Amino acid sequence: ILIALNKPAGIVCTAEKREKNNVIDFLHYPKRIYPVGRLDKESEGLLLLTNNGEIVNKIMRSGNMHEKEYLVTVNRPVTDAFLHGMANGVPLVELGTTTRKCRVERTGKKQFRIILTQGLNRQIRRMCEYFGYRVQKLVRVRIMNIELGDLESGKYRDVTPEEFKKLKQLIAHSSNQPVRPMEKPQKSKRKPRNSAIHGTYTVVNHHIDRENKNGNRKATD
């Protein structure tokens, strides 16, 4: 079983029945399934659910570098400096780490698209807060090759045979070792600030794969 849900805000990504508004009670799915990773209670969008533990581990393990894509709306205009800083790695002192470099693209005056290959706790919200931004809406629109598309909020669908075949190809050589909560990327001692990080950028305004090589310092992953 592998299904794609458009999770509404307010639903908690846990199989714990004791948790109020948990996703399992919300779905009332006839068979036992559990979520592939998490999506913040306040966030919405694509959530995969399955009964296959190997798929969960291969998708979620950070070292496998699988992509997850989000559309984010913030409380003030998105600047070039903000985009460059987000793309180049953000030190999150409270988690003792610096985020990996990622791809970011402006999609509106107060909106941007971001593609991550890791899933730190409330990562995008923390990254935005570092630069003095507040997330107003966060929607996950893609996990690897599976897209949210026009699936209505609160509805789910079966992953198609074609999607599942492609997914299996993408995870064929991925580690299936269980994700360990204590596993952390490289630590950072830098304190938060409300200014952009300079360096080798992986994004400009409208071309998500273009690179700016004029930076003067290289950020760590």
Where is each model-derived feature located?
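Basic, flexible Lys/Arg- and Gly-enriched helix-loop patches that mediate nucleic-acid binding at interfaces
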Residues: 1-221
